[in-house]
């Protein structure tokens, strides 16, 4: 009995589903027929056309009036099988001329007010859409219009070349963000005294190979083949590569430079050679009379200047041999501090006495291209170069006396716990009295911390425990145990 009832139930369900599907198909066909009549013949039914006024596609404007698929854009999808092919629309030859003479097309705006003004006929405006039709239904909004005239170039001539490629000679005409012009003038050095070039070209070939190979390449300041720019210490920078024309010094201070060892601005560009552990230093030459002769910013080799009594370089200036400045022959080795002190004393005599007529060499050490800021103490405190030397305008060492010995700062800003101000800590119980309530320190008994046993077990105040003479704000006693004291 059950076997005979099961197929009948399924057949009834199948019949019900088929009936519902037929009804839905009939309803869908009726709706599609109405939509097709509205979209294909908008003027036949007046009632439906008023309800769907924004749907018709404008036949004037950019779209050609007669297209095989143009009438289907606003309604249902076209029948693919009835279309011959998807050929691109053939624009009329004078479409730009028609757009040019169209009223209210010169501006590009998305505001509804401009669209209301642009409607030639006084028809009421419908809902605004930036990419939709005008209120009169004749053309698109100005945002969808092509250029106003055939010679219209929205971004200038460089962007309208064939293939949208810009020739190199017109790169500077592109209206885009430009970087600092000092970047492009970094390599521009003008030699002041060309008669010293022959003497300095000879020294470049005498330099070690690692110094010759360490010359900055195209990305650096100077190219190795332009020897007249490499070996002349009388080079004045161009442009604003050092911040200002008056501030003629390297803006990046060398590594280990502190205290009164200041950067020299203007005519006093002298620096102490004892500012770097390996003496890798930018060569700076200072003069009393503000001579415009300056060294290249990143010259990888050092030079020697002979100063006469007036403070200007004498015509018998030579380049010192590279061995005198080759402090880095042993990699990682510290410099000879005695030679450094002698050079520093000679340098001080030159600047304080005005320079000896026949002697007094200033040895500028080798300088790195990239150096960090003042981050640590010097190896040996040296005397100041000149009493009238001043640092950069933005340097924090403006108010320091150049002749005073370097004073180590009492307050440091490092993260090491030795230099931090540690507050006083006292172990107390809930009543405020020091006692044996700190159960969290019971684990320290296994470590053999005898200084905490009396606190944990006997409840003695911390004053009786701290019998070692230790300074305040410290956790460390001479016994090597960690203890808390008041």
Swiss-Prot record:
Q: Where in the cell is it found?
A: Nucleus; Cytoplasm, Cytosol
Keyword set includes Cytoplasm: yes
A Gene Ontology annotation in the biological process aspect, one of them, is:
protein homotetramerization
> What segments bear the compositional bias annotation Pro residues?
144-160
The organism's place on the tree of life at top rank: Eukaryota
Phosphoserine: which positions carry it? 76, 179
- Fill in the PTM field for this protein: Phosphorylated by AMPK at Ser-76 and Ser-179. Dephosphorylated by tax-6, the catalytic subunit of calcineurin.
> Which residues fall in a compositionally biased region of kind Basic and acidic residues?
9-23
What GO terms fall under cellular component here? cytoplasm; cytosol; nucleus
Q: Which stretches are tagged as biased composition: Polar residues?
A: 34-52, 224-245, 387-402, 461-475
Expressing tissues? Expressed throughout the intestine and in head and tail neurons. Expressed in octopaminergic RIC neurons.
Annotated keywords: Activator, Cytoplasm, Nucleus, Phosphoprotein, Transcription, Transcription regulation
The UniProt record lists the keyword Cytoplasm:
yes
- Which InterPro entries does its entry note? TORC, TORC_N
Q: Where is this region: Disordered?
A: 1-62, 103-166, 214-278, 327-417, 460-486
* Chief location bin: nucleus
Q: What happens when the gene is disrupted?
A: RNAi-mediated knock-down results in increased lifespan.
Q: Which family does it belong to?
A: Belongs to the TORC family.
Its function? Answer: Transcriptional coactivator for crh-1, the homolog of vertebrate transcription factor CREB1. Regulates the transcription of metabolic genes and may have a role in mitochondrial dynamics and metabolism. Involved in modulation of lifespan. Through crh-1, counteracts the pro-lifespan-extension signals of AMPK both cell autonomously and, when expressed in neurons, at a systemic level, possibly using the catecholamine analog, octopamine, as a messenger.
Q: How does it assemble?
A: Interacts with crh-1.
Name the chain's protein.
CREB-regulated transcription coactivator 1 homolog
